[in-house]
Amino acid sequence: MKTLLLLIPLVLTACGTLTGIPAHGGGKRFAVEQELVAASSRAAVKEMDLSALKGRKAALYVSVMGDQGSGNISGGRYSIDALIRGGYHNNPESATQYSYPAYDTTATTKSDALSSVTTSTSLLNAPAAALTKNSGRKGERSAGLSVNGTGDYRNETLLANPRDVSFLTNLIQTVFYLRGIEVVPPEYADTDVFVTVDVFGTVRSRTELHLYNAETLKAQTKLEYFAVDRDSRKLLITPKTAAYESQYQEQYALWTGPYKVSKTVKASDRLMVDFSDITPYGDTTAQNRPDFKQNNGKKPDVGNEVIRRRKGG
């Protein structure tokens, strides 16, 4: 029972996860980060359901969240030496004796037939000698455990990389081609496809327990897409989302290792807010007013003004 009570503070004290500032895109990527960003992007794009566009010629419009940012992450891996440390110090008793020199002073006073002699003894204000005696034993004991990490959590400054956006756009075009959907310039298209990429970046985190430690790097890609028939203004694909994340993790014991390295790709949480539940206003007076009734199985159409704005015209 005593051993258990001693281990509980050791395991629970200073436990937590330090998460670095997320950054979109990135500057000079290292190989693992490239692999994760590519994996999450490919998985999200691959999940897009484009069956309604079979045999069509599509104009593709991709809008990506700004990929410029910077963060400063400082601090190294913690050392157990600061948490497990003890010492014992004992000094013997000490006594000091001081010897002050003494001197005599004689004063004689005469007046006619009378005279007097005064003698006094004084001590100097500074000792002539000092003697110190120690009694008892002197001892000093100390104990400690020091476990340092293999490196510091270095500073990061991530700059914009427009090639990330170009890479993602090319992936989307590749999937369209492999699905049998032709991507053409807007003037030759019969369908407009809009893809909005809300999340496209990496997140670093560190978990520090006394016995277990981990370094984790995640890459996330989250996007929303819909398609519009250019002639009828009908929604061929209502707003849908695709979200995936990839992860690289190194696990340590007392920052020794890593004893395990893992890579995973999985579906992540969807967008916090999407447009799948938006319907046209019932009292709109705009030209090409959508004809839409909830739960009637029909798809809303989209007016020319909406298309023009999405194109940036």
Swiss-Prot record:
Write down the membrane topology: Lipid-anchor
S-diacylglycerol cysteine lipid sites = C15
- Give the region (Disordered) as residue ranges: 282-313
User: A Gene Ontology biological process annotation?
Assistant: cell adhesion
N-palmitoyl cysteine lipid modification positions: C15
The record's induction entry says:
Induced during interaction with human epithelial cells.
- What is one cellular component GO term in this UniProt entry? cell outer membrane
Q: Which UniProt keywords apply?
A: Cell adhesion, Cell outer membrane, Lipoprotein, Membrane, Palmitate, Signal, Virulence
Tell me where the signal peptide lies.
1-14
Biased composition, class Polar residues, residue ranges: 282-297
Cellular localization per UniProt: Cell outer membrane
What other comment is given for this protein? Present in outer membrane vesicle formulations which are used as vaccines in human.
Annotated family: Belongs to the MafA family.
User: What is the name of the protein in this document?
Assistant: Adhesin MafA
Species, as recorded: Neisseria meningitidis serogroup B (strain ATCC BAA-335 / MC58)
What are the top taxonomic ranks of the organism? Bacteria, Pseudomonadati, Pseudomonadota, Betaproteobacteria, Neisseriales
Gene responsible for this protein: mafA1
